[in-house]
Amino acid sequence: GLYAPSALVLTMGHGNSAATVNPERAVTLNCAPTASGTHPAALQACAELRGAGGDFDALTVRGDVACTKQFDPVVVTVDGVWQGKRVSYERTFANECVKNSYGMTVFTF
């Protein structure tokens, strides 16, 4: 094909680490050749990831979101392929509001 594959599965669950968390939600995100998948904002999430060069750690917290300090950790995992390179990513957030405040749409599922 003319494009490198970008197909990801993102999961979210409550707990401290992916090793011990049961995924409560899972969505798919395909970004090539066009944006698709069960991610609720696939088009925007693909554009956001392209802007970040596929680097999930580059998705930083937005200043316009106020979250409580409540500690109810959630773990997000991302596995699959981004522009032909294997991806395996895990990040723990203090609570779901904090998770949703990183980046714009990638983690909001």
UniProtKB/Swiss-Prot annotation:
- Give UniProt keywords alphabetically: Disulfide bond, Protease inhibitor, Secreted, Serine protease inhibitor
**Disulfide bridge partners, by residue number:** 31-46, 67-97
Gene Ontology MF term list: serine-type endopeptidase inhibitor activity
Q: Which family does it belong to?
A: Belongs to the protease inhibitor I16 (SSI) family.
UniProt entry tagged with the keyword Secreted: yes
- Write down what this protein is called: Plasminostreptin
State its role. Inhibits plasmin, trypsin, subtilisin, and other microbial alkaline proteases.
Q: Where in the cell is it found?
A: Secreted
Query: Mind naming one GO cellular-component term on file for this protein?
Result: extracellular region
Source organism per entry reads Streptomyces antifibrinolyticus
Query: Which Gene3D superfamilies does the entry link to?
Result: Subtilisin inhibitor-like (3.30.350.10)
Taxonomic path: Bacteria, Bacillati, Actinomycetota, Actinomycetes, Kitasatosporales
- Assembly with partners or alone: Homodimer.
